[in-house]
UniProtKB/Swiss-Prot annotation:
Encoding gene (name): prfB
Modifications made to the protein after synthesis: Methylated by PrmC. Methylation increases the termination efficiency of RF2.
Residues with N5-methylglutamine modification: 251
InterPro entries the record matches: PCRF, Pep_chain_release_fac_I, Pep_chain_release_fac_I_sf, PrfB
Organism of origin: Chlamydia pneumoniae
Pfam families in UniProt: PCRF, RF-1
Protein name stated in the entry: Peptide chain release factor 2
Length: 369
């Protein structure tokens, strides 16, 4: 047992040393934090409140990441301390605690290893995720709500802030369409793996004959863009429509036309927002989403060009079916791109296993930094 634990400790020591230099890049993060903290201490820092808010978010994120590294290193030091005490290893309770610490450290290092595959220019950004009901009527609307719950729980697990930007409920149950914003580091890098069509097979609870139904929902993901990225949008290229909100919003719902829909005529991209209380706020949110969607198109064009330049790379078809969720006659979730699968459908829909599917996708299609 001692020999096995010593080997695991040595592996952790090696991996955290590598993480400090490359995976985590501790020196770079500390320098970035120092620069941002110096900027935030300037006298006129809050004159541009939007920019100041973004800088403050970056500072909080960097501090949290550096703290995570320091805590992990402390845990490894503590493990080493206990391993030097042979008598302590005779205590089952201490051995159980050591195993928990080992698993925690190994899991955290695995997360950093995954983030090494997130080297795209927008991978660190927050993102918008949209789910639309496909063929299947009421069943598909229920499927959208199930996916929305899965992604919400998954985002909470990653400690990302969640904001529903736009939502249209189904006529009977569920959701026809929903757009949610995930705010946090690497939100886009992880969520982009979910872009595509998701297929559900189950015995419908809405069918009195108990027949098996197949439903579809499409997921789209696009990154929030920062101030450094400029997307030119000409006012003449926009058609702006207003309508009454059909969702939450207090006394203003269905009273004033506060909801906004913007169509970008050259590209055909359509965005809408009804979450805010005023038309002005909804319009601002729409413009942010439109910029993000147009930026996503730029990224996709670059990716397609890279695929042509690299014949050895597997094709990534964004609009295709990516995953099957089967409840009957057996239970199985299978990603058709990677072959990764699980028989625990409920844990998947609880957001507990989604990272495993995303990691498999990144291992096959991600770019190593």
């Amino acid at each position: 047992m001692q020999e096995n634990l010593d080997k695991r400790l040595e592996a952790l020591r090696t991996e955290i040393s590598l993480a400090a230099r490359s995976l985590f890049d501790l020196d770079k993060k500390q320098k970035e934090l120092q620069v941002l903290e110096e900027e935030s201490s300037e006298e006129n820092f809050w004159q541009d409140s939007v920019h100041a808010g973004k800088i403050s978010e970056q500072i909080v994120s960097l501090r949290r990441q550096i703290q995570e590294y320091q805590e992990l290193k402390s845990k490894i030091d503590a493990i080493e301390f206990f391993l030097e005490d042979a008598d302590a290893l005779e205590d089952p309770a201490i051995c159980e605690d050591l195993e928990k610490e080992f698993l925690f450290c190994e899991k955290k290092l695995a997360v950093w290893e995954t983030q090494r595959l997130l080297s795209g220019e927008a991978d660190k950004n927050s993102c918008f995720l949209t789910i639309n009901a496909g063929a299947g009527g009421t069943e598909s609307c229920d499927w959208v709500e199930m996916l929305f719950r899965m992604y919400s729980r998954w985002a909470t697990k990653h400690q990302w802030a969640l904001e529903v930007v736009d939502r249209l409920d189904g006529e009977v149950v569920g959701i026809k369409h929903v757009t949610v914003k995930f705010s946090g580091m690497y939100a886009y890098g992880y969520a982009k793996a979910e872009r595509g069509v998701h297929r559900l097979v189950r015995i419908s609870p809405f069918d009195s004959n108990g027949k098996r139904h197949t439903s579809f929902a499409s997921v789209d993901v696009f990154p929030e863009i920062d101030d450094q990225i400029k997307i030119e949008i000409r006012p003449n290229d926009l058609r702006i429509d207003t309508f009454r909100s059909s969702g939450a919003g207090g006394q203003h719902v269905n009273v004033t036309e506060s909801a906004v829909r913007i169509t970008h005529l050259p590209s055909g991209v359509v965005v809408s927002c009804q979450n805010e209380r005023s038309q002005i706020q909804n319009r601002e949110s729409c413009m942010k989403m439109l910029q993000a969607k147009l930026y996503q198109q730029v990224l996709q064009e670059r990716l397609e060009k890279q695929s042509l330049d690299r014949k050895d790379k597997k094709e990534i078809a964004w609009g295709s079916q990516i995953r099957n969720y089967v409840f009957q006659p057996y239970t199985l979730v299978k990603d058709v791109r990677t072959g990764h699968e699980t028989g625990n459908v409920q844990a998947m829909l609880d957001g507990e296993l989604l990272d495993e599917f995303i990691k498999a996708y990144l291992a096959e299609f991600g770019e190593v930094s």
